[in-house]
Curated annotation (Swiss-Prot):
<comment type="function">
    <text>LIF has the capacity to induce terminal differentiation in leukemic cells. Its activities include the induction of hematopoietic differentiation in normal and myeloid leukemia cells, the induction of neuronal cell differentiation, and the stimulation of acute-phase protein synthesis in hepatocytes.</text>
</comment>
<dbReference type="GO" id="GO:0010646">
    <property type="term" value="P:regulation of cell communication"/>
</dbReference>
<dbReference type="GO" id="GO:0008083">
    <property type="term" value="F:growth factor activity"/>
</dbReference>
<dbReference type="GO" id="GO:0048861">
    <property type="term" value="P:leukemia inhibitory factor signaling pathway"/>
</dbReference>
<comment type="similarity">
    <text>Belongs to the LIF/OSM family.</text>
</comment>
<feature type="disulfide bond">
    <location>
        <begin position="40"/>
        <end position="153"/>
    </location>
</feature>
<keyword id="KW-0202">Cytokine</keyword>
<feature type="glycosylation site" description="N-linked (GlcNAc...) asparagine">
    <location>
        <position position="95"/>
    </location>
</feature>
<dbReference type="GO" id="GO:0005146">
    <property type="term" value="F:leukemia inhibitory factor receptor binding"/>
</dbReference>
<dbReference type="GO" id="GO:0005125">
    <property type="term" value="F:cytokine activity"/>
</dbReference>
<keyword id="KW-0325">Glycoprotein</keyword>
<dbReference type="GO" id="GO:0023051">
    <property type="term" value="P:regulation of signaling"/>
</dbReference>
<dbReference type="GO" id="GO:0045595">
    <property type="term" value="P:regulation of cell differentiation"/>
</dbReference>
<protein>
    <recommendedName>
        <fullName>Leukemia inhibitory factor</fullName>
    </recommendedName>
</protein>
<dbReference type="InterPro" id="IPR001581">
    <property type="entry name" value="Leukemia_IF/oncostatin"/>
</dbReference>
<dbReference type="Pfam" id="PF01291">
    <property type="entry name" value="LIF_OSM"/>
</dbReference>
<feature type="glycosylation site" description="N-linked (GlcNAc...) asparagine">
    <location>
        <position position="118"/>
    </location>
</feature>
Length: 202
């Protein structure tokens, strides 16, 4: 499902991710002006690189924390249960122009943010005592929100991009316990894989 994103998207995504819903955001008009809520920082690309380096550096630890918390059969069947087999994940082309890479990064962050919201919601029910996992998921989502805001600032101020089509992953609310755990593991495996490529591209 696709929606249009504009300057108000960071705030809407904060609300969207907080509740972990899998439903799309309201549609923003195509002719929306390119405006950000706050002035952009002068060292924006450095901030984007630092945020990418941070999430890249913590992605593997989050992945391990996740599959360990799920218990058997996950830790001993990572290739089968946690392989990054997510077919609708937004693509990224590391050799594209900066504008193209930023647009693709925006789509990836929006997808990941909604996915982390779903994973966090599920884990609070399935593994209520896995507090370190909950904390790590929240910290990652917080960094991604800041990254999304910075990417939007850069797109708006330098390239006058007023909207970006974004898509969200599957909502897990109707799935059984095992499928919720498996999909979360696959998404975090994909996240770990993709964020490493993205971080090197900037």
């Amino acid at each position: 499902m696709k929606v249009l994103a504009a300057g108000v998207v960071p705030l809407l995504l904060v609300l969207h991710w907080k509740h972990g819903a899998g439903t799309p955001l309201p549609i923003t008009p195509v002719n929306a002006t390119c405006a950000t809520r706050h002035p952009c920082h002068s060292n924006l690309m450095n901030q984007i690189r630092n945020q990418l380096a941070h999430v890249n550096g913590s992605a593997n630890a989050l992945f391990i924390l996740y599959y360990t918390a799920q218990g058997e059969p996950f830790p001993n069947n990572l290739d089968k249960l946690c392989g990054p087999n997510v077919t609708d994940f937004p693509p990224f082309h590391r050799n594209g122009t900066e504008k193209t890479r930023l647009v693709e990064l925006y789509r990836i962050i929006a997808y990941l943010g909604a996915s982390l919201g779903n994973i966090t919601r599920d884990q609070k029910v399935l593994n209520p005592n896995a507090l370190s996992l909950h904390s790590k998921l929240k910290a990652t989502a917080d960094i991604l929100r800041g990254l999304l805001s910075n990417v939007l600032c850069r797109l708006c101020n330098k390239y006058h991009v007023a909207h970006v089509d974004v898509a969200y992953g599957p909502d897990t609310s109707g799935k059984d316990v095992f499928q919720k755990k498996k999909l979360g593991c696959q998404l975090l495996g994909k996240y770990k894989q993709v964020i490493a490529v993205v971080a090197q591209a900037f």
